[in-house]
Amino acid sequence: MSDLKTMMLNFGPQHPAAHGVLRLVLEMDGEIIERADPHIGLLHRGTEKLIEHKTYLQALPYFDRLDYVSPMSQEHAYSLCVEKLLQCEVPIRAKYLRVLFCELTRILNHLLNISSQALDVGAMTPLLWLFEEREKILEFYERASGARFHAAYIRPGGVAADVPEGLIEDIAKFIEQFPQYIDDVDELLTENRIWKQRTVGISEISIKQALDWGFSGPMLRAAGLAWDLRKSQPYEIYDQLDFDIPVGQNGDCYDRYLVRMEEIRQSVSLVKQCIEKIPEGPVKTEDRKISPPPRTEMKRSMEALIHHFKLYSEGYHVPEGEAYAAVEAPKGEFGVYIVSDGTNRPYRCRIRAPGFAHLQALDFMAKGHMLADVAAIIGSLDIVFGEIDR
């Protein structure tokens, strides 16, 4: 029996089911996976180093380019971290707008994940249905910020600008008809025999194992632990909103899918609550050293013009110190740790990407499964290499 050899198989980095540039070296015993070795770094752009040479405002767009399928969540974490260092108050309307767009971002992310995971195991219809809905949300992004993806909308001190007239009403109309599409996908997948055969019991993980690997977000909740930063460590106005935390039982691919489906419904409810409660008022801090003055003021006041020039040429100086801010991003806990040396540039910025912890457990989760299950497992991890490779 000693002459039995395992086979080495390269999965990716051009494989469509690799969800980006993942090179996976699989050690196979026939169809069974003995070892899975992820090779990352093919999308490494040195973001953390680049940020050290930019002002605090110039560093913001880099965060859109990390997890590029849910951009606003990353900006949010960065802005909260800078605001902690500046000890700056954000107007209440800006907080509502932030939460509104972050929940739309969560829907955006889960629509992509569910449809592409279904495509990986052979179901094509959800992709065609859900991408149409994603396009509508991206249109809201564009109307608010001018860009479909790289919005740079949430900024330290508030948001870039107030939403244009009619946008809130259009989001309300969209949110009214949108749940019907989720029900259709639910009908198509949830009790589908083939879908269940491909996902039930695949890569099961317990709460303890999930915590040991550093899981967060839907991956941790699918294992059965109701841990959500929006409830456990509320930020912005989440403590004033009413929502449930969906949890799974078995921590397998199927439970992760169910958790994400329910999270979409909870996000719909949160968006409705934001639209009902959003007050009138300013959308950025009145401190002109942090946020630029309005154009009309600049045309009239020399002081406003100087503030504007200083802000965009030199940027603001952040007090010496360090801060960590984390948000419940669609993929898990997205954290930003900034060390400031009192200048206008961060001394060090560390980014905690949730996908990194999930991918490191791939060997543990894939061991003993079949080759065909790798696509289902990677799809359920919801990984994007912009944030993993940074």
Curated annotation (Swiss-Prot):
CC terms in the record's Gene Ontology section: plasma membrane
Coiled coil spans: none
Reaction(s) catalysed (UniProt annotation): a quinone + NADH + 5 H(+)(in) = a quinol + NAD(+) + 4 H(+)(out)
Protein EC: 7.1.1.-
Signal peptide segment: none
SUPFAM superfamilies assigned: HydB/Nqo4-like (SSF56762)
First-level EC class: translocase
Pfam families on file: Complex1_49kDa (PF00346)
UniProt keyword annotations, A-Z: Cell membrane, Membrane, NAD, Quinone, Translocase, Transport, Ubiquinone
Membrane topology: Peripheral membrane protein
PROSITE patterns referenced in this protein's UniProt entry, alphabetically: COMPLEX1_49K (PS00535)
UniProt GO MF annotations: NAD binding; NADH:ubiquinone reductase (non-electrogenic) activity; quinone binding
Keyword Transport appears in the UniProt entry: yes
Subcellular location: Cell membrane
Matches recorded under HAMAP family: NDH1_NuoD
Function of the molecule: NDH-1 shuttles electrons from NADH, via FMN and iron-sulfur (Fe-S) centers, to quinones in the respiratory chain. The immediate electron acceptor for the enzyme in this species is believed to be ubiquinone. Couples the redox reaction to proton translocation (for every two electrons transferred, four hydrogen ions are translocated across the cytoplasmic membrane), and thus conserves the redox energy in a proton gradient.
Assembly and interaction partners: NDH-1 is composed of 14 different subunits. Subunits NuoB, C, D, E, F, and G constitute the peripheral sector of the complex.
Entry similarity comment: Belongs to the complex I 49 kDa subunit family.
Protein name as annotated: NADH-quinone oxidoreductase subunit D
Gene: nuoD
